[in-house]
Amino acid sequence: MTPSIGSDHANSASDEEILSGAASSSDESDYLDSGVSRKRRRTAEISQDKAGKVEPEDDDDDDDDDDDDEELKRVLSTIAAPSRIKRNVPGDKKEVQAKPVVAPKNTIQAPTDPNTTFSALDVRPWLVQSLENMAIKRPTGIQKGCIPEILKGRDCIGGSRTGSGKTMAFAVPILQKWSEDPTAIFAVVLTPTRELALQIFEQFKAISSPQSLKAILVTGGSDMRTQAIEIGKRPHVIIATPGRLADHIRTSGEDTICGLRRVRYVVLDEADRLLNATGPGSMLPDVEECLSVLPPATERQTLLFTATITPEVRALKDMPIKPGKQPVFVCEVDTQTLAIPATLKQMYIKVPVTHKEHYLHTFLLTEANVDKTVILFCNRTSTADYLHHLLRMLEHRVTSLHSKLPQRQRIDNLARFRASAARILVATDVAARGLDIPEVSLVINYDLPRDPDDYIHRVGRTARAGRKGEAVSFVGQRDVELALTIEKRVGRDMEAWEEEGVNLETRVVRDALKLVSEKKREALLEVEEGREVGGKRKRTKQKLRVD
């Protein structure tokens, strides 16, 4: 039986401290937030209990320790919290079942023969050799299903788990068709993050090494004039983020963008993110701007790939067939079962929000984790920056990746992590999609994401291509509702984290409490003074004075 979140050691004194200190951290980790005092809030809860109505706590806890322990136990036992906080009742535990998804009529089932080769999919010998040079010898399920149909000229919607080889599922047929008619501009690939665009760019260059493919990268953080010149030279493939390509369409002039009007292939990688029309940071307006100058749908092939099938993507399956076009084909591999790899082990650790950093430092140094390559996800850039400072002061080999970093530093930091110069990457969700770093064996959710689909993409950075991996989520008392939502989405419960011979709470008190508290103050001071990691003051551009 899997222990329930928030109730594993309910009678221990350490757990009382955890529960009394836990607060909402679903979208932030700011332990400086102040709320209504615990004493007043408990008094209100007791009066509600007497009236027969008890509501969950809504405010963060502070450090008031005047209340009696027995009163605390009684109040906590009456809180109308989700079932995962309550004690386990024999026979009351139910398995979380993923809802079956009915596949559309035009869905193609990928071949299941494990002996299928790329040659059997009509892939040209030079491409097969390039794939073998990259240690890719047999196609994955999504590649088996998509490559033959794309070569036939059909539009595609491909859905498959993270780490299943979706990039090669569209890169291989595009390069094969390009080699038969190497015109420019042959393909445009749109993707939501700069790092993913860079990775796709590198994969296109690697697989096309026997040929003279000219591919360019068009992303934010780089000089627009240089990019405009490169676009004007008519490369064969453009890999871009929609925001920067839309900027060129609006400002770079017809001479620069006229080549886009003859594109043969348009790829929307991570289509669920690109087509999301809700919430801040929607990329849909920029995507529409990009599509406005590309050939109409009847004159190009459109390929959509995603790990999470959203309503926006699903709606495209039922669009009417345009005259002169073959029906859109849909290839979904394993999307009707679990949304995460079977080789991924999901776990959680109960932590008080006031001591998350202490638990993190201690957890990273346990015998099982001290040598692992780790991606640590946060919800905010400020949290990622702060943790980068803190973990470096605690002598961890760490780097960071988030949107507030200059593009050059983002590239350098990711390169350090790939080269194992840093074993920990502190990142926001810019690193959650598409990045393929085989050495990553552990993903930590320092903050639980609000959207369960973001959780799927985060934990998908490990356990890729059949390898094993672990994902550990830090769960505060008020994160339980969110954790349950995530479990329902992925179709599997999280297990309580355990390591033989390790009591995390004891180690926190014994080894980390004083040390981490001191380093927290130093890290916060560095961040407040605007210093770089390591203590140097950040350089700022200064205007030249003309005397």
Swiss-Prot record:
Show the GO MF annotations.
ATP binding; ATP hydrolysis activity; RNA binding; RNA helicase activity
Q: Where is the composition biased (Polar residues)?
A: 1-13
Q: Which gene encodes it?
A: DBP8
Matching entries from PANTHER family are given as: ATP-DEPENDENT RNA HELICASE, ATP-DEPENDENT RNA HELICASE RHLE-RELATED
Localization recorded for this chain is: Nucleus, Nucleolus
**Locations of Acidic residues compositional bias?**
56-70
SUPFAM superfamilies xrefs? P-loop containing nucleoside triphosphate hydrolases
Keywords on record:
ATP-binding, Helicase, Hydrolase, Nucleotide-binding, Nucleus, Ribosome biogenesis, RNA-binding, rRNA processing
Looking at the UniProt record for this protein, which Gene Ontology cellular component terms does it annotate, in alphabetical order? cytosol; nucleolus
Protein name as catalogued: ATP-dependent RNA helicase DBP8
* Domain Helicase ATP-binding intervals: 147-327
Catalytic function, reaction form: ATP + H2O = ADP + phosphate + H(+)
Instruction: Tell whether Zinc is among the UniProt keywords.
Output: no
Give the location of motif Q motif in residue numbers. 116-144
- What organism is the protein native to? Gibberella zeae (strain ATCC MYA-4620 / CBS 123657 / FGSC 9075 / NRRL 31084 / PH-1)
Query: What is the residue range of the motif DEAD box?
Result: 269-272
Q: What is known of its domains?
A: The Q motif is unique to and characteristic of the DEAD box family of RNA helicases and controls ATP binding and hydrolysis.
